[in-house]
């Protein structure tokens, strides 16, 4: 990697990969950079709010299931707007999915990290850079109020639940040989 691509790689590692590795206990809090420790605060707050609202469960036993479920949820999440709050929801969702895979001992957490990395690189990074990059994300994380966090969590949940409900309906129709 060289030049601009290396800069983008570093941004994604700072914002996304570091938090996921911390969340799944692959690295300790002391191994986080000062920047990562700052954004960890808002992401932990998002995670706590999300946990109070709903228990997210996954059924992930293959690389294809991870890619399908992940892509479905995050595409729905960002289909009409990208903002820092939704990016926080995306990061927390990615971390939860990776932790599920690690806890299930199915050795697929690296697939989640790679899928999240690629989605951020190709779909979110251009927006992030045009909206101030790491500095603006840090400013957002330091100055978010409870209302905006709750609003973004509720929006994320509505998109997640809509996607999962749709998948459940499709599966039910398939089970009944209706499609």
Curated annotation (Swiss-Prot):
Q: Which GO terms describe its cellular component?
A: host cell endoplasmic reticulum; host cell mitochondrion
> Where does the chain cross the membrane?
none
Tell me one GO molecular function of this protein: BH domain binding
The keyword Transport is annotated on this UniProt entry? no
Q: Where is the signal peptide?
A: none
PROSITE patterns noted in UniProt: BCL2_FAMILY (PS50062), BH1 (PS01080), BH2 (PS01258)
**Record-given protein name:** Apoptosis regulator Bcl-2 homolog
């Amino acid at each position: 990697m060289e030049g601009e691509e290396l800069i983008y790689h570093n941004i994604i590692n700072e914002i996304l990969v570091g938090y996921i590795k911390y969340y799944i206990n692959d690295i300790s809090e002391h191994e986080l950079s000062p920047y990562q420790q700052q954004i960890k605060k808002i992401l932990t707050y998002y995670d706590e709010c999300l946990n109070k609202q709903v228990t997210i469960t996954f059924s992930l036993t293959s690389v294809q299931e991870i890619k399908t479920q992940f892509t479905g949820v995050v595409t729905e999440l960002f289909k009409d707007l990208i903002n820092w709050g939704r990016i926080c929801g995306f990061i927390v969702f990615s971390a939860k999915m990776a932790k599920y895979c690690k806890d299930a001992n199915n050795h697929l957490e690296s697939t989640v990290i790679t899928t999240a990395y690629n989605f951020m690189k190709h779909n979110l990074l251009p927006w992030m850079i045009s909206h101030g990059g790491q500095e603006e994300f840090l400013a957002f994380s330091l100055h978010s109020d409870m209302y905006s966090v709750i609003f973004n969590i509720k929006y994320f949940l509505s998109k997640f639940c809509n996607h999962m409900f749709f998948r459940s309906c499709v599966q039910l129709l398939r089970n009944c040989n209706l499609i």
